[in-house]
Every structure is written in structure tokens, then in C-alpha cells.
UniProtKB/Swiss-Prot annotation:
<dbReference type="GO" id="GO:0050803">
    <property type="term" value="P:regulation of synapse structure or activity"/>
</dbReference>
<dbReference type="GO" id="GO:0006907">
    <property type="term" value="P:pinocytosis"/>
</dbReference>
<dbReference type="GO" id="GO:0005764">
    <property type="term" value="C:lysosome"/>
</dbReference>
<dbReference type="GO" id="GO:0043231">
    <property type="term" value="C:intracellular membrane-bounded organelle"/>
</dbReference>
<keyword id="KW-0525">Neuronal ceroid lipofuscinosis</keyword>
<keyword id="KW-0333">Golgi apparatus</keyword>
<feature type="disulfide bond">
    <location>
        <begin position="152"/>
        <end position="160"/>
    </location>
</feature>
<keyword id="KW-0325">Glycoprotein</keyword>
<dbReference type="GO" id="GO:0043524">
    <property type="term" value="P:negative regulation of neuron apoptotic process"/>
</dbReference>
<feature type="glycosylation site" description="N-linked (GlcNAc...) asparagine">
    <location>
        <position position="197"/>
    </location>
</feature>
<dbReference type="GO" id="GO:0048260">
    <property type="term" value="P:positive regulation of receptor-mediated endocytosis"/>
</dbReference>
<keyword id="KW-0225">Disease variant</keyword>
<dbReference type="GO" id="GO:0008306">
    <property type="term" value="P:associative learning"/>
</dbReference>
<dbReference type="GO" id="GO:0048666">
    <property type="term" value="P:neuron development"/>
</dbReference>
<dbReference type="GO" id="GO:0035727">
    <property type="term" value="F:lysophosphatidic acid binding"/>
</dbReference>
<dbReference type="GO" id="GO:0043202">
    <property type="term" value="C:lysosomal lumen"/>
</dbReference>
<dbReference type="GO" id="GO:0048549">
    <property type="term" value="P:positive regulation of pinocytosis"/>
</dbReference>
Length: 306
């Protein structure tokens, strides 16, 4: 049996550990990682029926979170107009500068882009690694671009084909590329060389004209790259672009998944390596473009933000 003196020494020795344990119990939990949101075409940062509602849903489930919903312009109306007419590269530069100056983001942040905001935030991840983006969630983003108009009657329609060809005839002109946002991610699978040489945004971030190693390194630094596809999407054509798939080159009928594209097989962006490492997450939901239920959002998106 230990003597009283030995027990006293043991108690003294354990005292610092006991105090430390109690102190740790009273420490505040770490603040949740901030969230940056970029809205889609024709929307604004703070529409109570869209991004405003998303912000409230996130704040409800993650108390204390800092949510920055990007406003591109000085007014809500300007924000909406810029989603159509402000050069995408200029928008990305402006956002990168704003994020770098925000003291609440310096330890890292998650990002969630809706529709075209998905590929715009990917450009931020690739071009602006500081502050670091941790998870990127693309909700209906078009990462291989679009080659079709909203709610066309169908792939076999001669009218749709005619409209596509007409738009494509001017989509890659310098003036259109500089002034029309949607032209900057217009991707013609029939004239890949024209797209590759004249697309000032999408062809660049998808490494179509050469390999920018920093783009690849920065994208691969993401913990998770989550892509949400809408199974009944009537806006995005082809809908496979929401999972980084696209039309097979040379035609506009058959689509192929990401894993069969040259972007993946040549691993120009590191997507193949990310896929093998479990960094890519492919989610699908019923409904039309950006039609998400609260229940689905809470179950499938919130876990990547907590």
C-alpha cells in the first residue's frame, strides 16, 4: 500500500493535467469554415427566393457560419446585368481580389457555385490559391460548357440545330467573346479547333491550349470537388456537362462521361488523379435546373460545409 506522502506527490503531479482537461472543456469550439457563394445567370447575390434562401438554409444548419454571397457590381440590378454582359475573366479577377482582402477568409473557405457560378468558382480555385479554397460545390455548373439553347424541343430538332449553328457562327468573334458571358463557355463540339483557339474563358481553364501547371496544382489542392447534376434539367445542354462530360468530339448527338474525355485521359487538370483519390463527388437529384428541396440540400450538401 502506498504511503500518504506518495499519494500526495501523485496528486500534485496530476494537478496540471486535471486543470488542462477542465480548461479544454471550456474552450469555444472552432468556428465553422466560411462559405462563398456565386449565383447563376440572371440572378443576384441576395434574391430572397434564390441565393438569399440558400444563405438562410446554411445559417440555420451551421450556426455562426460566415456566408459571403458574391455581388458583382454596386447594385443588385448591376449584379444581374453583369451575369450576362461582364467579361468572365474580369469577374474572376474582381472576386479573387475581394477574397484576398476579406480577413474572415484567410484561413480558408468552402465555395458553392450555382449554374455558371460553378465554373466561375472553379476558375477562382485554379487561378487564385490564396486564400485557400477547401471544398468546391458546383450546383448545376457547366464545366465542359454548353452547346444548346434552353428548352429546345430536342436533340433531333432541325430548328435547334439551325439555332446552334447560327449562334456558333458569331459566338467566337472577339467582340462577342469580350461582351457576352454565355459565349465565353459556349463549346462547339463540331468545330473544336475554333473553340480551342477563340474561347477566352472555358478553353483556358480547361487547359485546351496548353498546360498551366499551376491550374492543375491548385485544383488538385481541393479536399473535395462536388458536382451536382439535375436529372430533368431543361436549361443546360448537354446536361452531362454538369458532371464534366460532353458531346463526343465531331458531333452533337452522343455524349460521353468525364472519364472518356481527353481532358480526363490526358489528365490535363488532374481530374483523373483526383477521381482515383476520391476527391471528386458526383451527386444527382431529380428536378429541373437548380430545383433543390430543402431536405435534399440538408442531406447531401450541408455535410460538405460543416
Amino acid at each position: 500500500m502506498a504511503s500518504p506522502g506518495c499519494l500526495w506527490l501523485l496528486a500534485v503531479a496530476l494537478l496540471p493535467w486535471t486543470c488542462a482537461s477542465r480548461a479544454l472543456q471550456h474552450l469555444d469550439p472552432p468556428a465553422p469554415l466560411p462559405l462563398v457563394i456565386w449565383h447563376g445567370m440572371g440572378d443576384s447575390c441576395c434574391n430572397p427566393l434564390s441565393m438569399g434562401a440558400i444563405k438562410k438554409m446554411v445559417e440555420k444548419k451551421i450556426p455562426g457560419i460566415y456566408v459571403l454571397s458574391l455581388e458583382i457590381g454596386k447594385t443588385l440590378m448591376e449584379d444581374v446585368e453583369n451575369s450576362f454582359f461582364l467579361n468572365v475573366n474580369s469577374q474572376v479577377t474582381t472576386v479573387c481580389q475581394a477574397l484576398a482582402k476579406d480577413p474572415k477568409l484567410q484561413q480558408g473557405y468552402n465555395a458553392m457555385g450555382f449554374s455558371q457560378g460553378g465554373q466561375f468558382l472553379r476558375a477562382v480555385a485554379q487561378r487564385c490559391p490564396s486564400p485557400p479554397m477547401i471544398n468546391l460545390i458546383s450546383v448545376g455548373g457547366q464545366h465542359q460548357g454548353v452547346f444548346g439553347l434552353p428548352r429546345c424541343p430536342g436533340e433531333s430538332s432541325h430548328i435547334c440545330d439551325f439555332i446552334r449553328k447560327t449562334l456558333n457562327a458569331g459566338a467566337y468573334s472577339k467582340v462577342v467573346q469580350e461582351r457576352l458571358v454565355q459565349a465565353e463557355y459556349w463549346h462547339d463540339p463540331i468545330k473544336e479547333d475554333v473553340y480551342r483557339n477563340h474561347s477566352i474563358f472555358l478553353a483556358d481553364i480547361n487547359q485546351e491550349r496548353g498546360i498551366n501547371e499551376s491550374y492543375k496544382k491548385n485544383l488538385m489542392a481541393l479536399k473535395k470537388f462536388v458536382m451536382v447534376k439535375f436529372l430533368n434539367d431543361s436549361i443546360v445542354d448537354p446536361v452531362d456537362s454538369e458532371w464534366f462530360g460532353f458531346y463526343r468530339s465531331g458531333q452533337a448527338k452522343e455524349t460521353i462521361p468525364l472519364q472518356e474525355t481527353s481532358l480526363y485521359t490526358q489528365d490535363r487538370l488532374g481530374l483523373k488523379e483526383m477521381d482515383n483519390a476520391g476527391q471528386l463527388v458526383f451527386l444527382a437529384t431529380e428536378g429541373d435546373h437548380l430545383q433543390l428541396s430543402e431536405e435534399w440540400f440538408y442531406a447531401h450538401i450541408i455535410p460538405f460545409l460543416g
